[in-house]
Amino acid sequence: MELPNIIQQFIGNSVLEPNKIGQSPSDVYSFNRNNETFFLKRSSTLYTETTYSVSREAKMLSWLSEKLKVPELIMTFQDEQFEFMITKAINAKPISALFLTDQELLAIYKEALNLLNSIAIIDCPFISNIDHRLKESKFFIDNQLLDDIDQDDFDTELWGDHKTYLSLWNELTETRVEERLVFSHGDITDSNIFIDKFNEIYFLDLGRAGLADEFVDISFVERCLREDASEETAKIFLKHLKNDRPDKRNYFLKLDELN
């Protein structure tokens, strides 16, 4: 893989190990330098105006560096074809790798939401609201950047009678919900929340972060608890919300199908 000089100079002779996790179109590699681990992330400039943009995520990491525990941004670079960033590995583990009780998992997700909600949204560099996400989704659809739909293996509760991405997109365009904007992670999962030995929470994969409705993150947490803990744990989480909005949760889970 040919790299820009500034990126190659930092990596030196280190071996790049592929580190593909999740469905992001970005390429991720880990490497060691002076007994420390780093990550190189690269995205095509085709995604520059989307939440998959590595430059977008790098700016978000920089903005969040004194607000949340996030990976340290080392450098960024962009040429005509790709966007690059190098981050330093954190000394923590994803909660997916920990043996947690349902109650512990619930407590971590609640604390994660509290940390995110504590961030003042003044001067937040990015918008991730419905307008932005629908525009992004239409770009993916028009450019055939989404995976083929497996008609035998998809969530019928979310898809209903829809057979195409465009059909689902049309529904979401016509039924958009009102928004109460907060700072949102945008992609909370058990592989994007890490815990260190002091039980401090770290956030990773912040490409979708920005101003969005509060129920974006709530819907993801409810789904994580329902799938990784139990239906009862998810219900307990919802019970402690000031005001649950099942319509919003359903809307944002549907919107997630278009990314």
From Swiss-Prot:
NCBIfam families per UniProt: APH_3p, APH_3p_VI
Cited InterPro entries: AGP_Transferase, Aminoglycoside_PTrfase, Kan/Strep_kinase, Kinase-like_dom_sf
Single biological process term from Gene Ontology: response to antibiotic
Function: Resistance to kanamycin and structurally-related aminoglycosides, including amikacin.
Phylogenetic placement of the source organism: Bacteria, Pseudomonadati, Pseudomonadota, Gammaproteobacteria, Moraxellales
Active-site residues per Swiss-Prot or TrEMBL entry: D187
Reactions performed catalytically: kanamycin A + ATP = kanamycin 3'-phosphate + ADP + H(+)
Family the UniProt entry places it in: Belongs to the aminoglycoside phosphotransferase family.
Keyword Kinase included in the entry's annotation: yes
Alphabetized SUPFAM superfamilies for the sequence: Protein kinase-like (PK-like)
Entry keyword set: Antibiotic resistance, ATP-binding, Kinase, Nucleotide-binding, Transferase
Gene that encodes the chain: aphA-6
Signal peptide bounds: none
Catalytic activity, EC: 2.7.1.95
GO molecular function: ATP binding; kanamycin kinase activity
Keyword ATP-binding: yes
Entry protein name: Aminoglycoside 3'-phosphotransferase
CDD domains named in the record: APH
Domain of life: Bacteria
Classification via PANTHER family: 3'-PHOSPHOTRANSFERASE, PUTATIVE-RELATED (PTHR21310:SF41), AMINOGLYCOSIDE PHOSPHOTRANSFERASE-RELATED-RELATED (PTHR21310)
